[in-house]
Amino acid sequence: CAESMWTSAKALFSNAWDAIVKAYRKFCQWVDKYIGTFARLKMKIESLEKDAKKMDGMKIKSGEKKLEITSGNKNLAKPAITSAEVTYITTGRGLIAEVADLRKENATVIEMQRSQEDAVTKFSDALSGANFGDHADAVKSYDDLHTATSGILKKFKDKAGTNQMSAHDTTHAKAYSVAVLPGYQRVLFMLPESIDTKPQATDGAMDAMYDKFNAVDMKVVDGDPELKKTIKETIQFEAMSPSDIEELANELKKGVDDIIQYRSSKQYLKNEAAVRRLKETLEKTDTRRVNTSDDDASKYTRAAGKAAVAMARATMRMLSVPTKMVTFYDSYANFCIGIGRKSMSAYETR
């Protein structure tokens, strides 16, 4: 009877705690939507748009048509998709087009995250039930994990494409240029060969998979370190017209609205919960693996456990891609607002 009461009490506490966490996450979501980073960014953009509308009929000052950009000048430099060549954004139309491209990239990676919830949950279930106690269990557990992660890996490989950048290759992974960003940044997906091929059930094969999964990553790097040293210290940027400033603000606002809409959705909370569960399961699995005594583990079971943990960590890194892109959009939007304000200062005041 006492044991039954204790079990009921634990279940009641667990349910209450889950409800508290859910309510807290909804509160954080509300804060993020109305007074968070992107809500404040949207207010700055709307202020820029409002001020641009007041400039109708204003004339540019004599000799002020060209702005000298010395601070944050690299944000006007962009590498080619498959080479180290650099192009400069020097007009308002070019800047507007760049923001539109960034919105498309954000939409792509957000959709990648949006569609991963079931796959992440499936992978978490397989990881939670993994048993690396003996050879047979370890083989089955790794096979289950391999199957569970196949969908995530396929999306990552499909997004990687074929634009290889061998200069950025590492010992265990090839670099694929998936996007270029202003600021002379390049988005690289690091993928080993045969990452989705099921390995043989040997400790050597598991060690190789451990190295491969550790190499899986998404990096935002300088397009070319040597060329970056030669980027112009001062870039001549054509002062934007009031209509271009207004259009820039409108394009920036669309991107922010896309982000706010997603981050305030139920799907975002579900995805976040799935990733959080994966992280907790990963930590428990790794602790269980580390604490397994040498007497209970063979070379294979230990190697398979390490490979499984590396697989889970690689999955976590892949799932962080949208966050990195959204963070970049925030910083670049602030730079664009600065360019808009600098252009306004080139006009005569009434």
Give residue spans per PLM region.
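Low-complexity, intrinsically disordered, cysteine-poor segments enriched in small/polar
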Residues: 4-8, 12-15, 19-26, 30-33, ...
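Long, low-complexity or tandemly repetitive, helically biased scaffold regions used
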Residues: 1, 43-350
